[in-house]
């Protein structure tokens, strides 16, 4: 099978702290890959390096067979949720996504309605995002990540703030993405989410990535 991401001997330091330690791993196309670990274990740093948000101090990363570099173009065809999504608080979810769609190639008002409904949000809701719950903002961030129909999704702590119904709904959305042949990298501190969804699992601890299954 084809690998969509190749991480090769990646190290990252913040001052004297060694946050990624010689990390190497391949992520196969069309699967849900889980990375489980406590807060501060290095999960988010690895995700940011894969997306090109952070530059590794050594090692290489390939996404869709293209090397990710600090001075190269942002990796294409990726939907990303890393940390709590930021939106304009005085605008509705639909209005926020319309602004983002104006900067993107594929997205339009029909796409916006579809992705909002997909994650369980009402596209006609007028409530400003500043009055959204954390779970609603997470859903909106997920909708944003889906707007350009990416083949690869990088999801970091996607279930934060969701109630039990929201968790079930978003799990089903993620399973549906796999059924469409998309690849998902899911980082979480919650072992239950990882076990429920993932085809492969790695554990991150003190910057060291270990294959669990």
Put a short name on every predicted segment.
Residues 153-157:
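Catalytic Walker B motif of ABC-type/P-loop ATPase nucleotide-binding domains
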Residues 188-189:
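H-loop/switch region of ABC-family ATPase nucleotide-binding domains
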Residues 36-38:
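The feature captures the beta-strand-to-loop junction immediately N-terminal to the Walker
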Residues 59-74:
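Conserved ABC transporter NBD signature motif
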Residues 51:
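Helix-to-loop junction immediately C-terminal to a conserved catalytic motif
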Residues 98, 109-124:
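Conserved ABC ATPase "signature" region
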């Amino acid at each position: 099978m084809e690998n969509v991401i190749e991480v090769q001997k990646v190290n990252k330091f913040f001052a004297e702290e060694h946050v990624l330690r010689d990390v190497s791993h391949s992520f196969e196309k069309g699967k849900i890959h889980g990375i489980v670990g406590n807060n501060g274990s290095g999960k988010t740093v690895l995700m940011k390096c894969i997306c090109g948000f952070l530059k590794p101090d050594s090692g290489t990363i390939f996404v869709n067979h293209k090397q990710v570099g600090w001075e190269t173009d942002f990796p294409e065809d990726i939907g990303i949720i890393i940390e709590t999504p930021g939106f304009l608080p005085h605008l509705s979810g639909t209005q926020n996504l319309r602004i983002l769609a104006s900067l993107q190639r594929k997205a339009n008002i029909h796409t916006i309605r579809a992705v909002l409904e997909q994650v369980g949000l009402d596209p006609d809701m007028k409530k400003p995002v500043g009055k959204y719950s954390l779970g609603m903002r997470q859903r909106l961030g997920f909708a944003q990540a889906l707007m350009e129909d990416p083949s690869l999704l990088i999801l970091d702590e996607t279930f934060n703030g969701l109630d039990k119904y929201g968790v079930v709904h978003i799990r089903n959305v993620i399973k549906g993405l796999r059924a469409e042949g998309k690849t998902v990298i899911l980082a979480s501190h919650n072992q239950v989410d990882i076990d429920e969804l993932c085809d492969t699992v790695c554990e991150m601890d003190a910057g060291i990535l270990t294959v669990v299954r």
